[in-house]
């Protein structure tokens, strides 16, 4: 982990598990991570980017050295080996997919979470990423000795983004765009809290500023992030080079 990234972590008093997670991940990344990914067919683009460099002189919070890698195939390229492993696990009965199952509550018995309950939504063949039907056609309950909630963030729910906006940053923007579909709505965060989970760092969000509206949107307020090349040159509308530190893609 780079020097300034270490400074930028700024763990809070209640960050016990985030700190443990960070330590475990750094150990993994410095050890078996590359060989493990490569053995599954993962490859990276042979140019290391320098994003979040902490200002133009690499002395602020951020990466003091280039360390940003782009996967060959971008998002689908990183998902493919894990999807393959998941489908192999499904074939031998170690994993079950329950698509179109919406969790509405966590099941608690004698103070212990032991399952989930919710609604079965009608089948929908709409294009991936578009808003699908919410029509309920049934219900379900699933039980397990351990329950892990991994439901994503709140980027598709601008009301929730504004509700959790850090006071130190003033008023949230009036106009926002979304880099994620509408179903990334943070709904399970509230459901999990209602079941007794302790939430921390609600105000810690990561929103990129170098985004534009998708001219051919798939989901509501669809935004596209601009991913520039390493140390690219940027100019204003009159052809003058942007002064430091106004370099998109370098410190956000």
Residue ranges: model-predicted function:
Residues 1-26, 40:
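Glycine-rich active-site loop/strand segments that organize a redox cofactor
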Residues 23, 68-73, 175-182, 221, ...:
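Hydrophobic alpha-helical scaffolding
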Residues 123-216:
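Glycine-rich loop(s) and the adjacent beta-strand/alpha-helix scaffold that form part
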Residues 189-191, 195-252:
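An anion/pyrophosphate-binding glycine-rich loop and adjacent beta-alpha core
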Residues 1, 34, 239:
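Polyanionic/metal-chelating signatures
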Residues 22-140, 144, 158-161, 212-213:
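Conserved redox-cofactor binding core of oxidoreductases
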